[in-house]
Design a protein with these regions (language model features):
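Short, conserved micro-motifs composed of acidic
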Residues: 1-202, 206-213
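Short amphipathic beta-strand segments in non-cytosolic proteins
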Residues: 215-218
Length: 218
């Protein structure tokens, strides 16, 4: 309900310039995009993709920068207390190759990463892979595992997205002789993110009855 968008915008929704913005779903459509302040953000590629974590405090990018290994690499940025974002950090050679990585999607566990790549061995010109974050630097990952021929085709596959339940995914795929379509696929246990519990509610100060701000514990 809150998609990230390429470019920044004026208050009348006309395009302002390069960057990242975010819109929100409303009862009547979509809000005017809100420009996101990201430290030293730039992208040397004409394409970019973003994904925000379930708690909206982590943002992943597929962009090309001076420290990229090849074309676009995967980067991570973290929300700061003032509402701005840290400078995008390259997620390392465990996931990035000397060609193109794209369409990152972070599972609700904040550990399981799905992404597309033309650099890792696959069935077509771009396949979807899964990897697990091993520690908190966001640069150490398990060996990316190809999602297999049930999901990946001899052509192009990308934009893998799953809900918090983790039972199924939506994927964009190009089959031989056709254009790109969206497909729904059910996930085996090996392809699911770690289970998480999402609890909604308010924690109030016993005396003032005012909300207490806190980070969720996993």
């Amino acid at each position: 309900n809150s998609p990230m968008l390429m470019n920044t915008y004026n208050e009348d929704a006309t395009q302002l310039g390069a960057g990242v913005s975010q819109s929100a779903r409303t009862k009547t459509g979509w809000s005017i995009p809100v420009n996101q302040k990201i430290d030293n953000y730039y992208n040397r590629n004409q394409y970019a993709e973003m994904n925000q974590s379930t708690n909206q405090k982590i943002m992943l990018f597929a962009i090309e920068r001076s420290d990229s290994y090849g074309e676009r690499d995967l980067y991570v940025s973290f929300l700061k207390p003032d509402g701005s974002w840290t400078e995008p950090k390259n997620m390392g050679a465990d996931v990035n190759t000397f060609t193109d990585e794209g369409a990152p999607f972070l599972g609700a566990d904040d550990r399981t990463l799905y992404f597309s790549s033309a650099g890792w061995p696959g069935y077509g010109n771009q396949d979807i892979f899964i990897t697990k974050r091993l520690e908190d630097t966001w640069t150490k990952w398990s060996m990316p595992m190809n999602m297999g021929p049930t999901i990946n085709s001899p052509e192009w596959d990308s934009y893998y997205t799953i809900g918090a339940s983790g039972d199924f995914a939506i994927v964009a795929s190009s089959k031989p002789g056709t254009g790109s379509d969206l497909y729904k696929v059910y996930l085996p246990a090996s392809a699911k993110p770690d289970a998480v519990s999402i609890v909604y509610g308010k924690v109030l100060n016993a005396k003032s009855k005012q909300p207490i701000e806190a980070d969720a514990a996993r």
